[in-house]
Amino acid sequence: MDLLIVCVLGPQSSGKSLLMNYLFGTSFLSSSGRCTKGVYSSILRFKDKDGNFKRILILDTEGIQSSEARDTTFDKRIVYFAICISHVVLICNKGEMNAPMSETIKLVADAIVNTSMSFLKNPTIYVILNMLANPNDKT
């Protein structure tokens, strides 16, 4: 595989951009409130141990369950998009498991089960709970 696609999902202000910047050294805008609109991307290029060039496509998505409420169609489209094209999907949540996060997990599960046009079958899904902007912040 010459291209690995990694996507991050989660509610607005859950630390999605911050996580991608930390993990991959990207420079997505990160602050409280809405920063990302739609899907932003960054490509990382590197050589593997055999000297072959590889790429990682990093996708930073707009927050779902936004306070600037749209209908749930937007959330479904973002989730289905991520599931259809990604090898790895990271789901961020600021805080403990709650009702909105449960809805996100249900959306992801539905997307995996119901998507027949998926670019890849069965992406790897990771859920990150208690994502804090400052690891020393206990709130």
Language-model-detected regions and their locations in the chain:
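Conserved GTPase G-domain substructure that encodes guanine base recognition and part of the catalytic core
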Residues: 1-139
